[in-house]
UniProtKB/Swiss-Prot annotation:
Keywords of this entry: Amino-acid biosynthesis, Aminotransferase, Histidine biosynthesis, Pyridoxal phosphate, Transferase
Gene Ontology MF: a single term: pyridoxal phosphate binding
Lineage, uppermost ranks: Bacteria, Pseudomonadati, Pseudomonadota, Gammaproteobacteria, Lysobacterales
Name recorded for this polypeptide: Histidinol-phosphate aminotransferase
InterPro entries per UniProt: Aminotransferase_I/II_large, HisP_aminotrans, PyrdxlP-dep_Trfase, PyrdxlP-dep_Trfase_major, PyrdxlP-dep_Trfase_small
EC class of the enzyme, as a word: transferase
Reaction catalysis annotation: L-histidinol phosphate + 2-oxoglutarate = 3-(imidazol-4-yl)-2-oxopropyl phosphate + L-glutamate
Listed SUPFAM superfamilies: PLP-dependent transferases (SSF53383)
Entry keyword Amino-acid biosynthesis: yes
Amino acid sequence: MSTASVMDLVRDDLRAFAGYASARTSALQGDVWLNANESAWGNPADPDASTRRYPDPQPKGLRAALAQLYGCAPEQLLIGRGSDEAIDLLVRGLCVPERDAVVVTPPVFGMYAVCARLQNAPLVEVPLVDGADGLHADVPAIVQAALDAKAKLVFLCSPSNPAGSAIPLAEIEAALQALQGKAVVVVDEAYGEFSDVPSAIGLLARYDNLAVLRTLSKAHALAAARIGSLIANAELIALLRRCQAPYPVPTPCAVMAEQALSAPALAVTQRRVTEIRAERARLHAALVQVAGVRQVYPSQGNFLLVRFDDAEAAFQALLEAGVVVRDQRAVPRLSDALRITIGTPDQNDRVLGALQRKQEAA
């Protein structure tokens, strides 16, 4: 598909949109900077005055490091405030209110629907299928729903939150082929580091209607830094960058993130991912033996979705043990479920101990 075709999916009124040109976007040179109305002095809380100036909108060093990490070109990557900002930019950039639909696969991460509703974009739901192999996406049904609704965006969460299932790469490619020139397929790989399924990023060379979301919040343990990446066609990235707020990446967060992508830090992250995967298998095997546990779904993420005979009792037993998990009971089709993040071995033992004591006391 030609580069122009993905841009045909962008809102007509935004294709020539220039956005806001901040003081940091100009390529001027000097040693006295008086162009952004910043303070000439640092704050007492900032002894080296490193935060008195506005940050680079897309820090070059961090952008290059993220591109290397994910295997794309820097111009194909946009840094944002977590994946949430990227989701919002995609919906606002592609969807005309009351016309262009967004396809989601509940139960799934709620921000896709939130952003669609804020844009007043029609929301099309294609529920996950609850089968013997877990809750999984019905990709042919998703594609058909997108075609029927003339959707502009299709969100595929892989691994899915909270279901834990991943979509095979061949099925993602089939969706991209079927929706070429019709919709952008957004693959949310927030939990990709924990998965056996390869990243969809490699498909970008053949399909410019692909967008991939990645984050440093999960495997890289930088949730508070809010460093998310949108990886997509370079022309689409340039357009969405013009739609983005002027200074999305605070300097302290960018510095920390770049340090986290050094070789020694990445080696630590990989060791922890390996440990989490091992603990995920151990906790899964142990939970299925606990009385009152109805089902433990297989997971490609750093969490397990668990159904209980009495989810309220399980939730309260964990709280009494000082363990806070995600209550899923208000989510349609998950009225008996809790989502449990994989913690340290000791933390996972506390989960098991609390649930086992609950059953012994029953």
